[in-house]
A protein has these predicted regions:
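Phosphate-group recognition and catalysis centered on beta-loop-alpha active-site segments
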Residues: 1-247
Length: 247
């Protein structure tokens, strides 16, 4: 069995998360797929950024939604991680997709629920994916499931991912993914370790599972032994131990 290694926010253990450097480092270190976060600016430009607040990453107050793209491009998104990354910028989604066009695996978008997206902004997001010819390699996930459904209505072919944070959510989220069709379950990994029978039950309904965020070899091996084939990680990539292990 071959395992799909998915770089969380790019190769975020060696470069500042969600930057072009982190995304490219994941490709260079042979991650199969990449996960990153998407938000929308005040002037309706999709960008790659995780937090609601800009403060942790840039040292600047405010949110992505409150800033224009020109304002965001003035901010340093690298120094918080290491001085050697001074000058890293928050990438636009368009820039990120251009950098990732060579990847042969999946792109997992985590659309953050920090702001309401207009119909036009959703069309902009989907348009960028299609213009990059990455529609058949994209999975959209979000805790805002209304937003997911809006995306599906705009693009009936787009693949969706439904989050699971705790075991009590499993029945409902599996049902949603099954009903949506062309969808996966995106689960916190311990939920699956605690309830491994759910793996086959879910697959019997035509729904695959990706787990997050696995950074210990022991957990990785346990999940693979249970049959999990898609694993999101911050650090278990390339020479960091397991990329070349095939089970």
């Amino acid at each position: 069995m071959s395992v799909e290694i998915i770089a969380h926010r790019g190769f975020s253990s060696i470069a500042p998360e969600n930057t072009l450097t982190a995304l490219l480092a994941a490709i260079y270190n042979q991650a199969n797929s990449i996960e990153f976060d998407v938000q929308i600016t005040a002037d309706s430009v999709p960008v790659v950024f995780h937090d609601k607040s800009l403060n942790r990453i840039t040292g600047t107050p405010g949110t992505i939604r409150e800033k224009t793209i020109s304002e965001l491009k003035e901010l340093d998104a690298g120094t918080w991680f290491a001085e050697s990354y001074r000058g890293e910028r928050i990438p636009t989604l368009e820039e990120a997709l251009a950098a990732l066009k060579s990847i042969k695996g999946w792109l997992y978008f985590d659309i953050k629920p920090h702001a309401i997206w207009s119909d036009l902004e959703i069309k902009t997001l989907l348009g960028l994916i299609q213009e990059a010819n990455l529609g058949d390699r994209t999975i959209l996930t979000s805790f805002d499931e209304d937003l997911l459904w809006q995306c599906r209505q705009s693009d009936p072919q787009i693949k969706l991912g439904y989050f699971v944070v705790n075991a009590s959510q499993l029945p409902q989220q599996i049902s949603k993914a099954e009903a949506a069709g062309n969808a996966i379950l995106s689960s916190q990994y311990q939920v699956i370790l605690d309830q491994p029978s759910i793996i086959q039950e879910t697959r019997n309904k035509g729904v695959d599972i990706v787990v997050w965020t696995v950074d210990k070899i022991i957990d990785f091996e346990r999940l693979v032994d249970l049959g999990i084939e898609r694993i999101i990680t911050n650090c278990l990539i390339g020479d960091n131990v397991i990329k070349n292990i095939t089970y």
